[in-house]
Structure formats: structure tokens, C-alpha cells
């Protein structure tokens, strides 16, 4: 088994409840010993979860945002922290705090990352009958748009479980976006920057139909689709301009 002591868990959280405690307990049980927990501007009544966990577990490093900056900002903050404070790091794994990522799956993604040197996406099976309709529709739609407009085959575009080798952290810390759109921009960066990625099948878990998610279906989905379409048109126009220059140059010969 690969050594997980040099892989940092990146765990952003906003207004947590007891599920965050279960996530941390599971990660520790499965051998993770470096957890970077980010309080992304939580309400005062939720802050005790962060303080209690950090006091109980020396494996936890606690980062604070005084105001909510967004999931993307929290992830990038943690990536920069690892780059500055974990010189021997082999990578990170991003995990959501709603207890929908089983720690065994988290470990499997990390082990595959260490074996292949690729970014590993933990991908759910949306054909399962207990998947909420909005989640099934949203993920299938986004996967289809990625396939058609970007040329990337990704079975779970909205997964928050991502194991990332340390060699790519600097690049991904500079990717644009501070909120949920950052995770989409990260996937587009794989395409633009030639970052290799692979998938790992994981459990499909939805607790109370994902009611604890801070993802706003219409608002955040539209922001994601705009990013993908903008990426498509940017590259299409670039290709057309390049072709026009080639044709113009040829006509002068």
C-alpha cells in the first residue's frame, strides 16, 4: 500500500454540522494523517466544529476565511499552503464535508494518483436509482456538454473528490474562479495545459437528497455552462483566425 502520510486532505467547509465530524473520523481511520480544514466564512454558531476538531486531532491544520470566499478560493488557498509548508508533499486530495465521499474511496483515488502520476477524479454512477433527479440531470447534461464542446469524456464533472499530484498544484492554484465554477475551470485546465487525468469509480451516496449542498442549481449551473461555451468559442475563433492568416499568406505567394 502506498504511503498516505505525504498526501494532504483538503477539506473546505461552510456552516458544517455533525457530518463534518464523521468525515474527519473516517479519514483518520483510513490512514490519512494530514488534514487541511478550511473554514470558508461560517456562521458563528457553526465555528465550534472547526475549533473542536482542531483541538482533538493534531493531524488537522485549520485555515480561516473571515468571510465566505467560495469553494474555489478555499481550495486554492489550501493548495498554496501545501506548496509553502509541505515541501515533501506527494499531492493532495480534495474532499467534501457532507460525508458523501467514503474514506475508502478517497484512499483508492490517492493510491491510483501515486501509481499513475495523474490527477484522479472520483466518479459516481448516476444510473443508480437513489440519485436525486436534479443531480442525475445536471451531471449528465454537463458531461454531454463537455463531450460536445470541449472534446473531453468525463463521467462525473461535478465530483468534489479529486486526487492531485503535487507537481500540478502550482498550475491549478492559478486557475480562475473562486466559487463552484473553479472546479469546472480546473477540468478545462487539464485540456488546455495537457494535465493527464484518470477516473476512479466510487460509491454514489446522497444524504437527504443532497440538501446540505450549497450548490445553487440554476445559478451555478448556468455559470458552469457559460464557462464551457466561452472556452469553445474562444478556441473556435482562434482556429478560424489562424486559418484566415494561413489562407491570406498563401494567397500572397
Residue ranges and their predicted role:
Residues 1-3, 175-248:
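Hydrophobic helical membrane-anchoring modules
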Residues 6-8, 34, 185:
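Cell-envelope/extracellular polymer assembly enzymes that use nucleotide-activated donors
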Residues 15, 40-42, 69, 78:
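Conserved short acidic donor-positioning loop in nucleotide-sugar-dependent glycosyltransferases
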Residues 15-29:
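Short, well-formed alpha-helical segments that are part of the catalytic scaffolds
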Residues 19-22, 44-53, 104:
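Acidic helix N-cap motif at the loop->helix transition within catalytic regions
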Residues 39-50, 67, 99-100:
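A conserved acidic beta->alpha catalytic loop
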Residues 66-67, 73-84, 103-180, 207-215, ...:
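Acceptor/aglycone-binding surface of glycosyltransferases and processive sugar-polymer synthases
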Residues 86-100:
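Short beta-strand-to-loop acidic/aromatic patch adjacent to the donor-nucleotide binding site
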Amino acid at each position: 500500500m502506498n504511503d498516505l502520510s505525504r498526501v494532504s486532505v483538503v477539506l473546505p467547509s461552510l456552516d458544517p454540522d455533525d457530518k463534518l465530524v464523521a468525515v474527519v473520523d473516517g479519514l483518520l481511520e483510513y490512514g490519512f494523517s494530514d488534514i487541511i480544514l478550511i473554514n470558508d466564512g461560517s456562521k458563528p454558531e457553526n465555528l465550534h466544529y472547526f475549533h473542536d476538531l482542531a483541538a482533538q486531532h493534531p493531524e488537522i491544520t485549520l485555515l480561516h476565511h473571515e468571510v465566505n470566499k467560495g469553494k474555489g478560493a478555499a481550495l486554492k488557498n489550501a493548495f498554496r499552503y501545501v506548496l509553502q509548508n509541505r515541501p515533501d508533499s506527494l499531492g493532495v486530495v480534495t474532499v467534501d464535508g457532507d460525508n458523501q465521499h467514503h474514506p475508502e474511496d478517497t484512499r483508492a483515488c490517492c493510491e491510483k494518483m501515486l501509481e499513475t502520476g495523474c490527477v484522479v477524479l472520483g466518479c459516481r454512477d448516476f444510473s443508480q436509482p437513489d440519485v436525486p433527479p436534479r443531480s442525475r440531470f445536471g451531471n449528465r447534461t454537463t458531461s454531454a456538454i463537455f463531450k460536445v464542446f470541449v472534446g473531453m469524456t468525463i463521467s462525473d464533472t461535478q465530483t468534489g473528490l479529486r486526487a492531485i499530484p503535487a507537481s500540478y498544484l502550482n498550475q491549478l492554484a492559478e486557475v480562475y474562479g473562486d466559487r463552484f465554477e473553479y472546479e469546472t475551470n480546473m477540468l478545462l485546465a487539464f485540456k488546455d495545459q495537457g494535465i493527464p487525468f484518470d477516473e476512479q469509480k466510487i460509491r454514489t451516496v446522497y444524504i437527504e437528497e443532497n440538501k446540505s449542498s450549497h450548490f445553487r442549481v440554476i445559478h451555478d449551473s448556468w455559470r458552469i455552462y457559460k464557462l464551457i461555451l466561452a472556452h469553445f468559442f474562444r478556441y473556435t475563433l482562434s482556429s478560424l483566425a489562424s486559418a484566415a492568416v494561413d489562407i491570406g499568406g498563401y494567397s500572397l505567394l
